A protein has these predicted regions:
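A Rossmann-like FAD-binding core segment of flavoenzymes
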Residues: 75-82, 98, 166-256
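C-terminal auxiliary extensions adjacent to catalytic cores
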Residues: 322-358
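FAD-site-proximal beta/loop scaffold in flavoenzymes
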Residues: 120-143, 222-226, 230-290, 294
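FAD-binding core/adjacent interface of flavoenzyme oxidoreductases
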Residues: 2-3, 70-145, 228-230
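Rossmann-like NAD(P)H-binding beta-loop-alpha module
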Residues: 134-168, 172
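Conserved N-terminal Rossmann-fold NAD(P)-binding element of oxidoreductases
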Residues: 9-11, 105, 149-150
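Beta1-alpha1 glycine-rich phosphate/pyrophosphate-binding loop at the start
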Residues: 2-73, 157-183
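Internal hydrophobic alpha-helix adjacent to the cofactor/substrate pocket in enzyme cavities
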Residues: 19, 284-311, 317
Length: 358
């Protein structure tokens, strides 16, 4: 078993921000490792542009080894199979065991797949991004009609990015499109989707797949052979057996200090964590990075921790697939190429800020 003073499990947005800060200033004392499934971290905000061909794969990812080297952190490649929260031991899929005096979890979430009967329909999830790209390359060789599940920002952006690449596209969401965002943003998104020929079905939750049919309740609502999942985040199965306290949906319950409610020596951020007033979004994970960095440093040095104050509102920018973007802020919305340039600048800046030479 390999032991560390601190293990950063997962190369999510918050952990990238922590590593960047430690590369620029002094990091906490002790042996620190970053555990990641692969040598790169993908920036999900650029996925629609990547799928639509506006970005190359190299534009959308951060090489982890240079960043870890600059932060004086060991890069450990491996996938988590189990976690014992009481002992803070991570069991990896290849049999290795890692133990941390402190742990920080930024491991994202999986995607909920509707129960499927038969194998007539191919199902592809929007994450992990590497598998999405592999599957999408195969689908591109023979374009067919397709459905997308997910009426959030990710589903809308993917629908607009793919509208010109498939013969017919349908977008299904269980509630209202872009629920919780500015009403004007929803109307603008609906207009763009309809203009691009996307069939939008609101308040149409998909409960199961039977052969090549999508069913809402007992009603068949769409027939085809390709389904892209862009909604329905679910915790990784190993979290349920970890002894960590969780919310009703199974996500890790955390305190304002970003510590797990049940285990103070384990921090959790991003999509895997649940805090009152915090929505699961990459934008919020980025904003957790400064507090997480400060609190990990304080924890290793025995100092008091800071509280993270979750934001109820944030700027929403949705790529429209043609170089433009839709913007939403509180009850105000706008759209156009100017906002697309602004979104591109923000996305490219994020990737550039976390790239280190060498």
């Amino acid at each position: 078993m390999t032991q560390y003073d601190l293990i950063l499990a997962g190369a999510g947005h918050a952990h990238l921000g922590v590593l960047r800060r430690w590369a620029l200033v002094e990091r906490p004392p002790g042996r620190i490792g970053l555990l990641s499934p692969g040598p790169e971290a993908w920036y999900a905000g650029m996925l629609p542009g990547l799928i639509s061909g506006r970005f190359s794969p190299a534009d959308c990812r951060v090489e982890l080894q240079p960043l870890c080297r600059a932060a004086k952190v060991e890069l450990i490649e491996g996938e988590i199979a189990a976690l014992d929260a009481d002992t803070r031991i991570l069991q990896l899929a290849d049999g290795r065991q890692l133990q941390g005096e402190w742990l920080s979890l930024n491991v994202g979430a999986g995607m909920a797949i509707p129960p499927q009967q038969g194998d007539a329909m191919q199902v592809l999830a929007a994450r992990p991004i590497e598998r999405l790209l592999e599957g999408w390359q195969q689908w591109q060789s023979e374009p067919r009609r397709m459905a997308i599940l997910g009426g959030g920002a990710g589903g809308v952006e993917l629908a607009l990015a793919l509208a010109d690449q498939v013969p017919a596209l349908a977008l299904f969401c269980g509630g209202s499109l872009l629920d919780g965002l500015a009403p004007g943003l929803r109307l603008r998104a609906l207009g763009h989707l309809r203009q691009r020929g996307v069939q939008v079905r609101e308040h149409c939750p998909i409960g199961r797949i039977e052969d090549d049919w999508l069913l809402s309740g007992d009603e068949p609502v769409w027939r085809g052979r390709r389904l892209l999942l862009a909604s329905g985040a679910r915790p990784w199965p190993w979290l349920a057996a970890s002894q960590l306290s969780s919310d009703a949906a199974g996500f890790i319950a955390i305190r304002p200090t970003l510590q797990c409610e049940s285990h103070a020596q384990i921090f959790a951020v991003g999509d895997s964590a649940s805090l009152d007033g915090m929505r699961r979004s990459g934008r919020f994970a980025v904003r957790q990075a400064p507090v997480l960095s400060a609190n990990l440093q304080a924890a290793l040095q025995g100092r008091p921790l800071r509280a993270y104050r979750a934001q109820w509102q944030s700027l929403a920018l949705l790529a429209t697939g043609d170089g433009g973007a839709l913007l939403g802020w509180h009850n105000w919305s706008a759209g156009g190429q100017l906002y697309g340039h602004y979104k591109d600048w923000l996305d490219r800046r994020f990737v550039k800020r976390h790239r280190m030479v060498g």
